[in-house]
């Protein structure tokens, strides 16, 4: 076997033995792209004239292939949501890239660097009335990476993380509603009415499921509804729950409150 297609070694000192397919894969690897995502930069703003959009000076990378739209006009459908696609067909050697306005996002994820076919990638959503453009929404530019390490980060939008929920019948009337954000933070809501419990007892009900268990003991404080008194519980690494409030007899006392802890 032979390792080929170096980008760092030129046997003739005049050119790299790398083809366009290899170059396309390099772009995608460096930016965390897949075949349904794009990179786009408008060097000047597109112009909307009646039922047309003109890309005056826009750079796009799709499928690892870089191209420029210079005064490229797309005809739009009236009273519609127009999904603007870049279509890359490498068999059309004279004009391998075309633009189309379609009625849905028809991005198809075709791997043009390792196989064949026409790659379609949506990069703009343009809404029209009967006479002109009413709104434009560029497709979000997405990267998929295994890990990121940064010194500083500023976020102007939202951060979406996986969310799991769990209700625990802790026993003795106490109930916990757990909401886990990512694999880091658990938010706990106390509810239910507690009875027949003494300080230091392990509660008699269900233990916390393994995915919600902390690495170290976590102490959470709640309060008794309508009273000026509080209590706390320990959630232990094995999932058991220990009561550290006052001793309570058979008369139930309603609980309320919220707490949180980090799993790790």
UniProtKB/Swiss-Prot annotation:
Region (Host receptor binding): 164-264
Keywords, in A-Z order: Host-virus interaction, Viral attachment to host cell, Viral attachment to host entry receptor, Viral baseplate protein, Viral tail protein, Virion, Virus entry into host cell
Record localization: Virion
Gene Ontology CC annotation, any one: virus tail, baseplate
GO biological process annotation, one example: symbiont entry into host cell
Keyword Cell membrane: no
Domain notes: The C-terminus is involved in host receptor binding. Host-recognition domains point upwards, towards the capsid.
Quaternary organization: Homotrimer; found as an assembly of 6 homotrimers. Interacts with host phosphopolysaccharides; this allows the virus to bind the external cell wall layer. Interacts with the distal tail protein.
Similarity remark: Belongs to the skunalikevirus receptor binding protein family.
Functional description taken from the UniProt entry: Binds to the host phosphopolysaccharides at the onset of infection. Upon activation by calcium, the receptor binding proteins change their conformation, presenting their binding sites to the host, and a channel opens at the bottom of the baseplate for DNA ejection.
Name recorded for this polypeptide: Receptor binding protein
The organism of origin for this protein: Lactococcus phage p2
